[in-house]
Regions:
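Beta->alpha turn/N-cap motifs
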Residues: 1-5, 149, 165-171, 201
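Hinge/lid segment of periplasmic solute-binding proteins
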Residues: 2-52, 63-75, 80, 98-99, ...
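Short helix-initiation/N-cap motifs at beta->coil->alpha
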Residues: 4, 69-70, 144-158
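C-terminal lobe and pocket-closing loops
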Residues: 170-180, 189-253
């Protein structure tokens, strides 16, 4: 599961502490270990890093826009051809958040290595600017306010819209649809990068398991190897992975 679930599991006593040695820890990107640390202890092995990206139809749009501000004009151009520029899930904040956060919006202020839950940045000037831009896209009929995950996914996979915003979990369905697609970073807004939430797909060990050492052996010497992750990735795309050596191979693709 993604790492955001693991704090609750650990709090309930469901996860065993893991103790990989430094040599193994060095094989993975350091920030991924931070995602699976609870009260100073490691509670899972990071597998992959999931985040939203811009997915585009290469046949409809060989060169995707670099900025959100380009999208209205692009949509007008594509509408003249019976297509639309962009459709994505507008029903869940997870998908709209990257735009809201781009110019300075934030959930909780992060300072000195911790979050201040009393400092919420969803109504500051940057958040309002991003949300206003999104509302204007809807008001000007560049997007439909009723668009949800399934509607957006179907439209992209049928070639009806040139772009969508989704994560690596969506790639296998696009592969099945035979759309000629590319994946790139989300557009910038007012010169600032979009800021999606990041999930670290992780594997933990049940605290009640009688086979903790076997589980550790499997995770460290089979799953978290180039060959192990390649086998998983062929079945279900992982996106970016925590293992440095295999991520370097993926980066060549």
């Amino acid at each position: 599961w993604a790492h955001d679930r693991f704090g609750g599991y650990a709090q309930s006593g469901l996860l065993a502490e893991i103790t990989p040695d430094k040599a193994f820890q060095d094989k993975l990107y350091p920030f991924t270990w931070d995602a699976v640390r609870y009260n100073g202890k490691l509670i899972a092995y990071p597998i992959a890093v999931e985040a939203l990206s811009l997915i585009y139809n290469k046949d409809l749009l060989p060169n995707p826009p670099k900025t959100w501000e380009e999208i209205p004009a692009l949509d007008k151009e594509l509408k003249a051809k019976g297509k639309s520029a962009l459709m994505f899930n507008l029903q869940e904040p997870y998908f709209t958040w990257p735009l809201i956060a781009a110019d300075g919006g934030y959930a909780f202020k992060y300072e000195n290595g911790k979050y201040d839950i009393k400092d919420v940045g969803v109504d500051n000037a940057g958040a309002k600017a991003g949300l206003t831009f999104l509302v204007d896209l809807i008001k000007n009929k560049h997007m439909n306010a009723d668009t949800d995950y399934s509607i957006a996914e179907a439209a992209f996979n049928k070639g009806e819209t040139a772009m969508t915003i989704n994560g690596p979990w969506a790639w296998s369905n696009i592969d099945t649809s035979k759309v000629n697609y590319g994946v790139t970073v989300l557009p910038t807004f007012k010169g600032h990068p979009s800021k999606p939430f990041v999930g670290v797909l992780s594997a933990g060990i049940n605290a009640a398991s009688p086979n903790k050492e076997l589980a550790k052996e499997f995770l460290e010497n089979y799953l978290l190897t180039d060959e192990g992750l390649e086998a998983v990735n062929k079945d279900k795309p992982l996106g970016a992975v925590a293992l440095k050596s295999y991520e370097e191979e993926l980066a060549k693709d």
